[in-house]
């Protein structure tokens, strides 16, 4: 008789076939809501349909079902992303001058779109050099493809097809994990396992495989390209992977294989895993060998991090323990209870993630120009400006989204009965002190930062330049910023002896790097003008935070409306008979926060655009004479409001205003059209609901007279709907206007 130990029970973490796949149900508009599914009585129905289609909280209160819907929707989102990527690569393969650009990136502009001559708009196809006519693109894809070692259009086709396959796979996964094998709630809440897999898998193995690709494919191919070898002569990627001798010709240590790794003689690999700092003078980008080294190091860190959390083996950290041990001398229960919040409220979790990702995106914006990662990126001024602007906008939206979901969490998921004296409770209990102090800071910053400009405008108008705040009169030098710049510029000889150059040329010290007579990067001087505009940045950011934080901290209750939580996330007013309680919902704070986010980002991208054109971007002659695009006028012009209007907005708008009849004319039309979209938003923001209801009723009367009245009764937009439409057009109109202004300018002069 054989005695066996009892088999360990495996936890079943999925439900099989929980929900049947029904096209009939999907075809019924509003199938997720009993009220909406009845069909339209009034035109408000279509608005409610859109507002609630993805508000899974309103479909059901079952957390497991909500989690499954979100999980499934994420696969749908990934599918769309793969489809978009595939389109980008397909355009590169089918409609672009990528191969020509690769052979001469300094004189040929990147283009991946050719306009068909339907009604004479082939004027939009400008000459980008090399005999190619098309629209100049500023997405940075060409530079990224070169960095990853793509040398011909066939490779782009293959990648595009691969992305389509992945898009289909994701679409299937979204259906499968909702209808066939849907994870149980416990699976979504198993944070340690999730951390291990995401850290070690996505970030660790992801970085490791990218480092491997760079070492075995990108580095050798880029070395050939930098040496001027014709792309058609360069061996194909698989040849480098399969034939070690090929690599050994470029990097002799490859002949030794993995021996130096196992014998800890790692310095052998210093040929292709470097620690140089600074920029490659041939391409004006970071050294690709530095980037490979970086990804290898990151991979090691995340592979270790992915083994830190306690799962089936009883060793490692437990998130709950970490959070509950986190107590300070003044924070009561500290983070106790936070674990429960973050595993039962996806809004709280999402809020945290959006705040982090938004901040990270803005960090990316600042690194893309100061440490340009791809070859020939730094000298493509249109792409530099686009990447900075794009990442700033995205970061701003994500941070506002963080506040939005924090407020939704407060209204829908926060349970005050179980929370006592933990960190969140303590913050809520002294919210008045927080908000009033923050308000004071905003007033101080606003008056002082704007006051400095007003002083300068006044002195300038009175003809008293000696009494202005400027580098040549009363100096307000940003001494702390300059100190940070100097510390970093001196780091290679002092605090980072292993590096040969500082991390970024912008810190100072180093010489400028120019590629093909164009400036890639140089030390950026900071002066009084930067000091002034930086305080405007501080002001706009603090006001944005004030609005958003007030929305979160007063989402459930306030002195004005103690029972706000019962009214929900968005509501127009606290019922009839209570004047002065309109526009106080958490949603309204997000609405107002969006406008200030727009203010903040606009000042940042204007500052960046002008500063770079004035002090960094430009050309260098054979004699070594440096000429900047706007000739260094930032320091003296941007210190007055009038200077911003005259020498930045007006002077630089000439290209977009005069673009008609040229290949940039689309930007002129967008500039006009986006101004209209923006102005259209004011109609929604400045007029009341009753005005439109009256107008509609008189129009309906006319229709009834002619017996053409519709069955669905027309209604004016609700207050919240009107404001939503208003802010959407305001932001889209403003962003598209800025886009047209920036690109027409920089493509014409850059």
From Swiss-Prot:
Keyword DNA damage assigned to the entry: answer is no
Q: Where does chlorophyll a bind?
A: 683, 691
Family named by the database record:
Belongs to the PsaA/PsaB family.
Q: Can you say what this protein is called?
A: Photosystem I P700 chlorophyll a apoprotein A1
What biological processes does GO assign it? Answer: photosynthesis
Quote the gene name from the UniProt entry: psaA
Q: Does the keyword Lyase apply?
A: no
Record note on quaternary structure = The PsaA/B heterodimer binds the P700 chlorophyll special pair and subsequent electron acceptors. PSI consists of a core antenna complex that captures photons, and an electron transfer chain that converts photonic excitation into a charge separation. The eukaryotic PSI reaction center is composed of at least 11 subunits.
Name the EC number(s).
1.97.1.12
**UniProt keyword list:** 4Fe-4S, Chlorophyll, Chloroplast, Chromophore, Electron transport, Iron, Iron-sulfur, Magnesium, Membrane, Metal-binding, Oxidoreductase, Photosynthesis, Photosystem I, Plastid, Thylakoid, Transmembrane, Transmembrane helix, Transport
SUPFAM superfamilies noted in UniProt = Photosystem I subunits PsaA/PsaB
**GO MF annotation list:** 4 iron, 4 sulfur cluster binding; chlorophyll binding; electron transfer activity; magnesium ion binding; oxidoreductase activity
**Which PANTHER family would you find in this protein's record?**
OUTER MEMBRANE PROTEIN, OMPA-RELATED, PHOTOSYSTEM I P700 CHLOROPHYLL A APOPROTEIN A1-RELATED
Residues crossing the lipid bilayer are 70-93, 156-179, 195-219, 291-309, 346-369, 385-411, 433-455, 531-549, 589-610, 664-686, 724-744
* Chain residues that bind [4Fe-4S] cluster: 573, 582
Indicate the principal place this protein occupies in or around the cell.
plastid
State the superkingdom: Eukaryota
């Amino acid at each position: 008789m054989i005695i066996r130990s009892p088999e360990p029970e495996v936890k079943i973490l999925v439900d099989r076939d929980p929900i049947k796949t029904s096209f009939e149900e999907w075809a019924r508009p509003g199938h997720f809501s009993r009220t909406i599914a009845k069909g339209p009585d009034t035109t408000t129905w279509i608005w409610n349909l859109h507002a609630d289609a993805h508000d899974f909280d309103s479909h059901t209160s079952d957390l497991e079902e909500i989690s499954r819907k979100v999980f499934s929707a994420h696969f749908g989102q990934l599918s769309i992303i793969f489809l978009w990527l595939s389109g980008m690569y397909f355009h590169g393969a089918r409609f672009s001058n990528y191969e020509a650009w690769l052979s001469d990136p300094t004189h040929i502009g990147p283009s991946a779109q050719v306009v068909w001559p339907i009604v004479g708009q082939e004027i939009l196809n400008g000459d980008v050099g090399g005999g190619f006519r098309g629209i100049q693109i500023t997405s940075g894809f060409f530079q990224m493809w070169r960095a990853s070692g793509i040398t011909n259009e066939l490779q782009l086709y293959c990648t595009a097809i691969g992305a389509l396959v992945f898009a289909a796979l994701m679409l299937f996964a979204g259906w499968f994990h909702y209808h066939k094998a849907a994870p149980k709630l416990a699976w979504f809440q198993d944070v340690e396992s999730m951390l291990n897999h995401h850290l070690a898998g996505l970030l660790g193995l992801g970085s490791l495989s990218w480092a491997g690709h760079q070492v075995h494919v990108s580095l050798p191919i880029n070395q050939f390209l930098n040496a001027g070898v014709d792309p058609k002569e360069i061996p194909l990627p698989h040849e480098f992977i399969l034939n070690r001798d090929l690599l050994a010709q470029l990097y002799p240590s490859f002949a030794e294989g993995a021996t130096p790794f196992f014998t800890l003689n790692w310095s052998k690999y210093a040929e292709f895993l470097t620690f140089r700092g600074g920029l490659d003078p041939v391409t004006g980008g970071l050294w690709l060998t530095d980037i490979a080294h970086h990804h290898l190091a990151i991979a090691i860190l995340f592979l270790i991090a992915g083994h830190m959390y306690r799962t089936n083996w009883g060793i490692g950290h437990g998130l709950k323990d970490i959070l509950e041990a986190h107590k300070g001398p003044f924070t009561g229960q500290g983070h106790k209870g936070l674990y429960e919040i973050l595993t039962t409220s996806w809004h709280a979790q999402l809020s945290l993630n959006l705040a982090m990702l938004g901040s990270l995106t803005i960090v990316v914006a600042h690194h893309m120009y100061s440490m340009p990662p791809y070859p020939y990126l730094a000298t493509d001024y249109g792409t530099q400006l686009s990447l900075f602007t794009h990442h700033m906008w995205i970061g701003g939206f994500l941070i506002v989204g963080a506040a939005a979901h924090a407020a939704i969490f407060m209204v829908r998921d926060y349970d005050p009965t179980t929370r006592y004296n933990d960190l969140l409770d303590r913050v809520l209990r002294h919210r008045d002190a927080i908000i009033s102090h923050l308000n004071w800071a905003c007033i101080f910053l606003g008056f002082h930062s704007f006051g400095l400009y007003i002083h300068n405008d006044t002195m300038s108008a009175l003809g008293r330049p000696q009494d202005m705040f400027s580098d040549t009169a009363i100096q307000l030098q940003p001494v702390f910023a300059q100190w940070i710049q100097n510390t970093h510029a001196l780091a290679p000889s002092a605090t980072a002896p292993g590096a040969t150059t500082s991390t970024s040329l912008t810190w100072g010290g180093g010489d400028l790097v120019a590629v093909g007579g164009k400036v890639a990067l140089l030390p950026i001087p900071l002066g009084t003008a930067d000091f002034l505009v930086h305080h405007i940045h501080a002001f706009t950011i603090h006001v944005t935070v004030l609005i958003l934080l007030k929305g979160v901290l007063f989402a459930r209750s306030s002195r004005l409306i103690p029972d706000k939580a019962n009214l929900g996330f968005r509501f127009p007013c606290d019922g009839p008979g209570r004047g002065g309680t309109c526009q106080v919902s958490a949603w309204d704070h997000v609405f107002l926060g969006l406008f200030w986010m727009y203010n903040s980002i606009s000042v940042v991208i204007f500052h960046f655009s002008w500063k770079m054109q004035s002090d960094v971007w430009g050309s260098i002659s054979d004699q070594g004479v440096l000429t900047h695009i706007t000739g260094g006028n930032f320091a003296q012009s941007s210190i007055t409001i009038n200077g911003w209007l005259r020498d930045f907005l007006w002077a630089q708008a000439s290209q977009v205003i005069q673009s008609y009849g040229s290949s940039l004319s689309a930007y002129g039309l967008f500039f006009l059209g986006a101004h209209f979209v923006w102005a259209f938003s004011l109609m929604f923001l400045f007029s009341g609901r009753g005005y439109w209801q009256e107008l509609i009723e008189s129009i309906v009367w006319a229709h009834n007279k002619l017996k053409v009245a519709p069955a669905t009764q027309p209604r004016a937009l609700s207050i919240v709907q009107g404001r939503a439409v208003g802010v959407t057009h305001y932001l889209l109109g403003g962003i598209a206007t800025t886009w047209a202004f920036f690109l027409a300018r920089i493509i014409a002069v850059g």
